[in-house]
Design a protein with these regions (language model features):
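Alpha-helical transmembrane segments and their membrane-interface anchoring/capping motifs
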Residues: 1-83, 125, 268-273, 307-309
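Internal hydrophobic scaffold segments of catalytic domains
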Residues: 15-20, 93-110, 248-249, 255-257
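Right-handed parallel beta-helix
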Residues: 52-66, 75-83, 96-192, 197, ...
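Short, flexible beta-strand-to-coil junctions
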Residues: 71-72, 91-95
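Detector for the N-terminal beta1/A-loop initiation region of ABC nucleotide-binding domains
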Residues: 72, 199, 238
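Short Gly/aromatic-enriched secondary-structure transition segments
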Residues: 83-93
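Short, hydrophobic/aromatic-rich segments at coil-to-beta transitions
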Residues: 87, 154-156, 230-231
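Short, surface-exposed interaction patches in beta-rich subdomains
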Residues: 187-188, 193-194, 203-309
Length: 309
C-alpha cells in the first residue's frame, strides 16, 4: 500500500472516531433535548422550533363542494371529520411564525394557499440530523383538511410543491392532483374523471374506486391495489414500475393494454400466452367478452406487474 494511501485511510478513520466521540458527547450532555426543542435550521443557537412554525388548531369551516389547494411546503392530508362538519388545521414553517395559510369559502369553493410568510422564506432543511439526535422523533408539517365521510366534492384541484398528499375516504367527481416532489396516496377513495400527476414521487390507489381519468409519473412507481376500475383509465410512467393488483374477477373483466420499452411484464399464468416480446420491449393485450372498463399501462423504463389475489 502506498504511503499516502495509508495516511489518508488512517486520517479518515481518526476523523470518524472523533466524530462519533463528539456526537456521543453532545447527546450525553443534552443534545437530544436540544434537537427536540431548538431549530437546527436557524442561524441563532437560541431559536426555538416553535418560533418559526405557524400553527392552527382544528377550526370549523363553512360548507363547500369544491376544493382548490396550492401548497409548497409540507404535506396535505384530507381525512374524515367524524361528523357532519368540515375543519382545517395546519403546522407549517414560516417567517417568525407568521400565519402561513390563507383560506376562504366563497360560492361553495374552499381555497387554501400559502401566504408570503412561507413563499418569501428560503428554507434549507438540515433536520435529517434531528432524527438521529432526538431518538427518531421528527416534527410533521403540513395541512390537514377534515370532511364528512359521505361528502361528495364536485371538483378537487390540488397543486403541491414539496410534500406528500394523502386522502382517506374522499369522494370526488372531477379534478386534478399534481405533485412536484412527493407521493400521492389514496385510501378508500371514490374518484371520477381525475387527472393525477407526480413528477418525483409514487402514486398509490388502495381499496377504492376509480372511474375514468389518468395517472402520469415522471420518476416514481405506481401501484393500484384492490381498487375497482371502470371507464377509460391510463397509467403512464417514464422511469418506474407499474403494479396492478386486483381480485381475479375484477382483473379479468378489464380490457388491458400494457407496454414497456425497457423492462419486463409479469402477468398471471392464465394470461401468459398473450405476451409479446421483442428485444427489450414487451407488450400485453387482453380483451374480455364484455369489458367493465379499459386500462392502459405504459412505462418507458420499468416493469409492469399484473396480479390477481
Amino acid at each position: 500500500m502506498k504511503k499516502w494511501t495509508k495516511t489518508a485511510l488512517l486520517t479518515g478513520c481518526a476523523c470518524c472516531i472523533a466524530g462519533a466521540v463528539l456526537m456521543f458527547s453532545g447527546w450525553a450532555s443534552g443534545g437530544k433535548a436540544y434537537a427536540e426543542t431548538y431549530d437546527l435550521n436557524a442561524m441563532s443557537g437560541s431559536a426555538k422550533k416553535e418560533d418559526g412554525i405557524s400553527t392552527q388548531e382544528k377550526i370549523k369551516l363553512d360548507d363547500f363542494d369544491e376544493l382548490q389547494a396550492d401548497l409548497t411546503i409540507g404535506d396535505l392530508n384530507i381525512l374524515p371529520s367524524g361528523d357532519d362538519s368540515c375543519y382545517l388545521a395546519w403546522r407549517i414553517p414560516s417567517k417568525k411564525g407568521e400565519t402561513a395559510v390563507e383560506y376562504r369559502v366563497r360560492d361553495g369553493v374552499l381555497s387554501i394557499e400559502e401566504t408570503s410568510a412561507v413563499s418569501d422564506t428560503i428554507y434549507i432543511n438540515i433536520d435529517f440530523t434531528e432524527e438521529n439526535l432526538s431518538g427518531g422523533k421528527q416534527s410533521e408539517t403540513g395541512v390537514i383538511l377534515y370532511v364528512p365521510e359521505k361528502k361528495v366534492l364536485k371538483k378537487i384541484e390540488v397543486t403541491m410543491g414539496f410534500g406528500d398528499v394523502q386522502m382517506n375516504g374522499i369522494h370526488a367527481e372531477s379534478g386534478r392532483l399534481q405533485n412536484a416532489d412527493g407521493d400521492i396516496t389514496l385510501f378508500g377513495c371514490d374518484m371520477q374523471n381525475i387527472k393525477c400527476k407526480a413528477d418525483y414521487g409514487d402514486v398509490e390507489l388502495k381499496s377504492g374506486t376509480w372511474e375514468n381519468g389518468s395517472i402520469t409519473l415522471e420518476d416514481g412507481d405506481a401501484k393500484i391495489q384492490n381498487t375497482k376500475l371502470s371507464g377509460d383509465v391510463s397509467v403512464e410512467n417514464s422511469y418506474g414500475d407499474i403494479e396492478l393488483e386486483l381480485g381475479k374477477k375484477d382483473l379479468e373483466r378489464l380490457e388491458i393494454t400494457a407496454k414497456t420499452d425497457f423492462g419486463e411484464i409479469d402477468v398471471p399464468d392464465t394470461m401468459e400466452n398473450l405476451m409479446q416480446k421483442e428485444e427489450d420491449e414487451q407488450s400485453f393485450s387482453y380483451v374480455p367478452d364484455q369489458p367493465a372498463g379499459r386500462i392502459t399501462l405504459m412505462t418507458k423504463d420499468g416493469d409492469i406487474s399484473l396480479e390477481n389475489d
